[in-house]
Amino acid sequence: KGTDAISVFVNRKGELEITGREPRGPVYAAYKFLETFGVRYWSPWRETVPKASSLAVRDDFRLDHHPPFDWRSGWSVSDCGDSPAMRAWRVKVGHNGSVPADCGGPYQFTYGETITYRYMKPKDHFDAHPDWYAYVEGRRQPTQLCASSKGGLDAFTAEIRAELQAHPEKRFVSLVSADNDQFCQCPGCRKIRARLKGGNAALEVHIANEIARRLGREFPDVQFTVLAYWTKEDAPQNARLEKNVAVGLALGHPHNLPVSKCRVWQQKAAGWEKLARDRLYIWDYYAGFNNFNEPRADFVNIAETMRHYARRGYRGVSAQLALGRTANFGELKAYLWAQFAWDPSRDI
């Protein structure tokens, strides 16, 4: 049971069965089985494969595992590109955010910024409909959408409907605001903030709920995502999320501690758990973005942080790690993160 569950065992005929939940489980099962013989996939460029003339398992051998996270996707020196070696490594370590079709294809979760970038592009609408966009510093600006603009929401709904009709395979659609803090301050949006008792996140939640209500019956298998990030970290206190709205958590925290020991992080996460406990996906950080080569001991917190996410029942995990072949412990962090994303309980 569960996304990407695997099972390896000796059946009654004495045959070794290597299987798992389709579409990716059987492939993961094969690689995890090899790990029991000492094979290690350290990075796309480094592996350990012990030499042996034969392999044998006991009749009672059994390897069963159900990853606690449905979605597991890193962004690191080991998997930030699309080279054949990186594509293969992602499969070997159990990532599923970007998987080739011949290995089962990806788990297509998304929570990247899309508003004004992918949808409702100002070059298409702003000149004719400035009222659809944010009122900032006394004038309409193409920085964000105006959450209280009926015309803007109608146009946004039409764009999302058209995309889902063109791509019926989609299961997640990101409705995340542009990566800036220039949110609408018009009277209508101020009322939304007051009603939901929230800041900028209240506007994103309002937009997502509107889209989710309008399109939910037409596309019942689709989830719409928002992102708790930067000026949107605090959950609106008086909001409810539609059942087809999921949340990404990109909450800042001290990197020298696991999140289970970060009081502020836990307070912010608790606010979102009240809204969508079974629909939370993590966007984490294990890098110093001013200098990837800067020594940082944050990799020692990966295990406990991932165990905390699993205990809380979060649905998926992703992380931005250091990039560049000379990055501080870059390959080691990527390997450890992948191992604990697959099984947070393991001891490495």
Question: Residues of each region from the PLM?
Answer:
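Feature activates predominantly on carbohydrate-active enzymes
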Residues: 2-206, 213-218, 248-249, 273-297
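Substrate-binding groove of N-acetylhexosamine-processing glycoside hydrolases
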Residues: 141, 165, 194-348
